[in-house]
């Protein structure tokens, strides 16, 4: 056979491959090897590409069967594609089939290839199937698709760039490339899911995609429909379960670190640092007021998104901005960076006006009232603002008008007549948030007048289909009015230049990059910056006296004016981009205003403004797998958290532990209880308490003499590694991941005490007693270190430990990068007592009921029915009316039952509120005017 | 030590590898990592196991023909995806049912040759098999026969408990 090939004149190097292919050819013809596929199964892609690569494509007998067909007799669940071999064996694993084609050609797999294939099966597939399901079956877009797979994509990208090889397993293509390419193709063929910053992944993907076997496989599997070709198949599959978020040690970047075995040098360095003791600590910055940037120092300006004044913030709002920013601010101060942390309430706008009307107060009175509520909530949560201001101040007017004048004189603003929605029944122009309708882009039924919650695109209220006044449900009419526009297209080039400089090497979160990039990709459009309102910053221009600036032009200027209220030298922070590093914290829905709108205003104003260096955006926190909802009484709101009897540090800990850092996460009562009882009580609290108790009980409260054995030295090195990782993560603002390091150190500590049993040794020989002393001394020093590391997360508990251990104030205020002996032999500690309390099941169940978690599904269902009924076209739909009537009846009996049981008043009130809401919807659906509640009751 | 690392140590002894390797564990699922002397670390139970087999010059345990090699790898993948991690009762029952049906006409997982697939499935299934009642053991008769056979294979069981299977059937009506 080989000879035959050579005679036909092929190159020598190709001889072997060809001969093998010829063998394969024979095999395929001789045997009844048959590939069973079904339309749109994702596994078809890699299998056909591998067959093509191995030259088997033409010879393969392919049978197309239905997705339910159980081709493999011994598997309960149907699995496709499947290769049936002539021996009767079945290959039902996609990579095993691919591997078989390669093996027939004589291509063996090395360790690295095997590792990639194992990773593909165990790590990539679970998250990829979620992403594909979201994209193809549920029609989701953007972050909902990307966030489940982001870590996996980053892992591939980093591996490729770290080894600087073009292929996964080295310089030449392997089975791993084909299998991973085939798995990822349906997703990555849409450039939206192949982020630019993953350059190595991008180039790998493109290299493979242009190869002939791959192209052919794509053509026959996806049939030019892209990922949608998988739809019919995936619809029939069970919805994949989102794999649990993994702790940081599973992060690709940390591969080397977690596989780390301690070297002699590391141990030696840890011992040296330990012995240096307190001398090695950095000097503590003297306290200043006001804090101002200092040349030559690291000047960190931190802002948290300004909460809207008339909403009481819920836990999702709190973790989304103020708490996350607080952890970073506290960490930044522990590092002795010159830090200023600011926030305040955002007070202007229609919502305030309306609220004022409702409560019979002036807008200013409403703002005063709610500003105080916010202040108290954040004080209770121990948020360490240097200043918590507000936007309704003269400084706000002055700075906003100054930026406006500069933009105007530089030609970045223009006037235009705007068609606006006006509700004749309410006789007012409708602000965006008072209009609802069908999204012109994605068809979502409940799009708001300014933005669609589903596709995230900004909307001009007038473009909404089937608009409705949210107050009276009347269809508004279009009237015209003159307005000012910010000419974003003119500023686009400057914005891109600035982003190009800023993004590289910065710590912007991936979702912030993604959202910003998608805005730029769609092209910027002019945005209206004025509104026909009274409660706002006045527009200083002839003909606009009765108008104010729209909040999204001036709310972000609030950061500047709040600083100006803090210090008259505010420009040292805000017009000093060379010396100031600006970190801005927010939830992802706020990103465009901070990454596009404000930077454009600031760049256009040409006044050397400080622009954001690191934009840190969180995903959303859900409540027990649903959404927080004030109107439905579902969820925990800032002011209620105080009444649960759970200390604020426990709330802080749990919210930070589940911080929606790279994907949405959920608040769950049971989980809160578990984390409190396992991580805080049994792990952290147990360790710190035992370490302190041993000092008190066995050594009279005096830290004993320590003589380090090799085991102790290794422990110090382990602790140092975790401490270093904690620093690395927090420098990148990976708050949730860094918390794991704290818990890991205390786990090390518990293990150390358990293995060395100081309580037994203290009763033994002289040597044993000395050993007990060393172990106790090292443990109590670890507790001291932990108290400082915990400070950003649980400031009160941290102070409690530091008081118990009598840690000197200078030591408490600075976190070193190494682990020195903080409590030397002879140091006298104070009185030690337990730090945490157990949360009991009954208590948690009670809270769950109180905050509506249990009724969530019910109310979601109702909501779905109700929202359908709200659409005007369906007003007279008898089916909708029947559904609503049923819902009212059902809710009515819920209320009666509760009353009969003499249930908690608040609970009854919540249910009654729901009933009334339903009745209103029913009345609307029937087209009746609203009856007074009493009349309804009699009916 | 994490379960996977322990299992790899058992495998080293079985293969007659003298120098004990050091393993660390990665992440919540405690995936084993092997730091090799001359190269980058290797991650994953199946990957490391195959590496050890090659190190011990016992390549026949990975299969001799293309077909056998693919079948071995398929069962190794089955081990790390289906047997590990999935621990709800229904999943386990389904898995045992499938395996029972598969093993009906086979001595070993690849058919007639003992391979790494048998070793890793034995280690992976041990924790489930020890908990089976006699009735269940008879229900999954082919799995029991295979398991009993493998646990008596020289050197494989080591400190793991020996699972007792009764030769005389106790439950005649179970299927």
Segments and roles (model prediction):
Chain B
Residues 1-109, 113, 127-131, 175:
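GST-like domain detector, emphasizing the conserved glutathione-binding G-site
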Residues 3-4, 154-175:
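C-terminal helix/juxtamembrane-tail motif
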Residues 69-81, 143-157:
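Short, mixed-charge aromatic SLiMs
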Residues 87, 134, 139, 170-171:
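Residue-level signature of transmembrane alpha-helix interfaces in integral membrane proteins
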Residues 109-132, 136-150, 160:
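GST superfamily/GST-like fold recognition
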């Amino acid at each position: 056979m080989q000879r035959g090939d050579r005679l036909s004149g092929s190159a020598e190097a190709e001889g072997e491959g060809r001969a093998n292919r010829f063998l394969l050819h024979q095999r395929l013809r001789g045997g009844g090897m048959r590939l069973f596929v079904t339309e749109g199964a994702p596994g078809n892609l890699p299998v056909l590409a591998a067959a093509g690569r191995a030259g088997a494509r033409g010879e393969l007998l392919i049978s197309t069967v239905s997705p339910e067909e159980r081709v493999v007799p011994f598997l309960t669940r149907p699995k496709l594609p499947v290769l049936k071999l002539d021996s009767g064996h079945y290959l039902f694993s996609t990579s095993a089939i691919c591997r078989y084609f390669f093996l027939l050609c004589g291509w063996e797999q090395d360790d690295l290839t095997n590792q990639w294939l194992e990773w593909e099966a165990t790590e990539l597939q679970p998250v990829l199937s979620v992403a594909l399901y979201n994209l193809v079956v549920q029609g989701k877009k953007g972050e909902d698709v990307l966030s489940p797979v982001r870590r996996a994509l980053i892992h591939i990208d980093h591996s490729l760039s770290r080894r600087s090889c073009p292929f996964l397993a080295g310089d030449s293509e392997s089975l791993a490339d084909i299998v991973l390419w085939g798995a990822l193709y349906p997703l990555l063929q849409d450039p939206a899911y192949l982020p630019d910053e993953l350059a190595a992944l991008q180039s790998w993907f493109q290299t493979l995609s242009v190869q002939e076997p791959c192209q052919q496989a794509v053509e026959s599997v996806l049939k030019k429909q892209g990922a949608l070709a998988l739809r019919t198949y995936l619809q029939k599959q069970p919805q994949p379960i989102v794999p649990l978020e993994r702790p940081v040690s599973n992060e690709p970047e940390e591969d080397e670190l977690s596989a780390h075995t301690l070297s002699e040098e590391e141990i030696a360095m840890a011992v040296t640092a330990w012995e240096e003791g307190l001398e090695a600590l950095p000097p503590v910055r003297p306290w200043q007021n006001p804090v101002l940037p200092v040349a030559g120092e690291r000047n960190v300006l931190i802002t948290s998104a300004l909460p809207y004044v008339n909403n009481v913030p819920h836990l999702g709002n709190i973790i989304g901005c103020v708490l996350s920013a607080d952890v970073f601010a506290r960490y930044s101060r522990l590092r002795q960076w010159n830090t200023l942390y600011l926030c305040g309430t955002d007070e202007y706008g229609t919502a305030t006006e309306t609220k004022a009307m409702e409560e019979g107060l002036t807008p200013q009175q409403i703002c005063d009232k709610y500003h105080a509520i916010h202040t108290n909530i954040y004080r209770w949560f121990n948020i360490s603002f240097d200043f918590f201001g507000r936007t309704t101040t003269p400084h706000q007017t002055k700075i906003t008008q100054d930026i406006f004048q500069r933009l105007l004189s530089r030609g970045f603003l223009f006037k235009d007549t705007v068609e606006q929605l006006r509700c004749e029944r309410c006789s007012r122009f409708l602000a965006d948030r008072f209009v609802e309708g069908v999204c012109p882009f994605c068809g979502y039924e409940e799009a708001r007048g300014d933005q669609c919650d589903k596709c995230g695109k900004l909307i001009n209220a007038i473009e909404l289909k089937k608009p409705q006044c949210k107050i009276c449900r009347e269809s508004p009419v279009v009237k015209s009015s003159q307005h000012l526009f910010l000419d974003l297209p003119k500023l686009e080039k400057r914005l891109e230049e600035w982003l190009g400089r800023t993004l590289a090497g910065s710590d912007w979160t991936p979702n912030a990059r993604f959202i910003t990039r998608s805005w730029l990709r769609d092209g910027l459009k002019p945005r209206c910056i004025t509104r026909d309102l009274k409660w706002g910053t006045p527009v200083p221009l002839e003909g606009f006296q009765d108008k104010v600036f729209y909040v999204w032009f001036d709310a972000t200027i609030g950061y500047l004016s709040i600083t100006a209220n803090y210090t008259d030298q505010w420009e040292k922070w805000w017009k000093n981009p060379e010396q100031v590093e600006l970190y801005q914290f927010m939830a992802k829905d706020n990103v465009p205003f901070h990454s596009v709108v404000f930077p454009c205003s600031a760049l256009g104003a040409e006044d050397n403004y400080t622009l954001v260096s690191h934009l840190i955006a969180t995903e959303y926190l859900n409540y027990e797998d649903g959404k927080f909802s004030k109107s439905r009484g579902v969820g925990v709101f800032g002011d209620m958290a105080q009444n649960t009897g759970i200390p604020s540090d426990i709330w802080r800990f749990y919210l930070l532990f589940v911080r929606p850092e790279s994907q949405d996460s959920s608040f769950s009562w049971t989980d809160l209880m578990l984390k409190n009882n396992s991580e805080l009580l049994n792990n952290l609290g147990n360790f710190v308490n035992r370490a302190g108790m041993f000092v008190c009980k066995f050594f009279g409260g005096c830290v004993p003499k320590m003589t380090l054995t090799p085991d102790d030295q290794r422990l110090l090195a382990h602790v140092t590694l975790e401490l270093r990782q904690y620093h690395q993560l927090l420098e990148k603002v990976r708050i949730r991941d860094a918390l794991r390091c704290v818990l890991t150190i205390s786990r090390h500590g518990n293990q150390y005490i358990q293995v060395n049993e100081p309580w037994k040794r203290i009763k033994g020989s002289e040597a044993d007693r000395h050993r007990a002393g060393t172990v106790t001394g090292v443990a109590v020093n670890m507790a001291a270190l932990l108290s400082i590391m915990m400070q950003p997360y649980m400031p009160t508990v941290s102070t409690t430990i530091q008081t118990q251990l009598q840690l000197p104030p200078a030591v408490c205020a600075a976190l070193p990068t190494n682990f020195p002996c903080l409590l030397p032999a002879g140091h006298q500690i104070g009185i030690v007592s337990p730090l945490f309390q157990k949360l009991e099941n009954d208590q948690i169940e009670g809270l769950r009921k109180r905050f509506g978690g249990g009724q969530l599904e019910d109310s979601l269902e109702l909501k779905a029915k109700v929202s359908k009924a709200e659409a005007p076209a369906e007003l007279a739909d008898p089916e909708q009316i029947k559904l609503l009537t049923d819902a009212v009846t059902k809710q009515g009996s819920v209320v009666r039952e509760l009353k009969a049981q003499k249930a908690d008043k608040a609970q009854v009130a919540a249910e009654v509120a729901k009933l009334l809401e339903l009745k209103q919807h029913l009345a609307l659906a029937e087209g009746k005017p609203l009856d007074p509640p009493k009349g309804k009751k009699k009916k | 030590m994490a379960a996977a690392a322990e299992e790899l140590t058992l495998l080293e002894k079985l293969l007659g590898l003298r120098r004990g390797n050091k393993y660390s564990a990665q992440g919540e699922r405690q995936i084993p990592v092997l730091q090799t002397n001359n190269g980058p670390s290797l991650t994953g139970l199946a990957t490391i196991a195959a590496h050890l087999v090659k190190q011990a010059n016992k390549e026949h345990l990975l299969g001799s023909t293309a077909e056998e090699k693919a079948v071995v790898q398929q069962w190794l993948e089955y081990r790390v995806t289906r047997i590990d991690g999935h621990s709800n009762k229904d999943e386990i029952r389904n898995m045992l049912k499938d395996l029972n049906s598969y093993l009906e006409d086979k001595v070993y997982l690849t058919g007639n040759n003992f391979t790494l697939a048998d070793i890793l499935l034995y280690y992976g299934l041990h924790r489930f098999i020890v908990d089976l009642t006699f009735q269940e053991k008879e229900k999954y008769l082919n799995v029991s026969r295979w398991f009993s056979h493998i646990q008596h294979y020289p050197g494989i069981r080591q400190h793991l408990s020996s699972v007792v299977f009764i030769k005389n059937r106790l439950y005649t009506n179970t299927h």
